[in-house]
Amino acid sequence: MDAVKKPFIAAVSGIKNSGKTTFLEKLVKEITERNYKVAVIKHDGHEFQPDREGTDTYRMQHAGAYGTCIFSRGQWQMLKKEPGMDVERLAQFFPEADFILVEGMKNSLYPKFEMIRGSVSKESVCIPETILALVTDTEQKLPGIPVLGLDEIKKAADILEKLAETNKKTGEI
């Protein structure tokens, strides 16, 4: 019996304005160009406004619906007010993905690239054992952890590819 394929989950983490979104956008582009299917889950440490005022789904939410969903022939989007959501539960919506990349989650146990930009941060804020590489424009170093420049996207993708391949063989991260 074949093992069920499970997406490899990794994060891009760091403090606010450290360049997570820009790095992640480039990393997604690089990985998809390597013919992998990628999903992204963004963690927001604050409550966010998911819809625009005036849309039908916005109106239904404000009328009291605890959940709304919109779909067309090729895509769908759902909003459900539910406390306690986490990456593992959301990942179930992307079973066909090769990679699920999470933006944020600096205190999680997911393997991660930690962003450190000198203009906004000077030191690591993530659990050292979870860091795949520091991505930085500073001299910051941590023992045994590779350091990448802010634009070393191909090297970051190589790290992910290698780790995902190892994970496939061993079943572990």
Identify the meaning behind each predicted range.
Residues V12:
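Hydrophobic anchor at the beta1->P-loop junction of P-loop NTPases
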Residues L79-N107:
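Phosphate-binding/switch loop-helix module in NTP-utilizing enzymes
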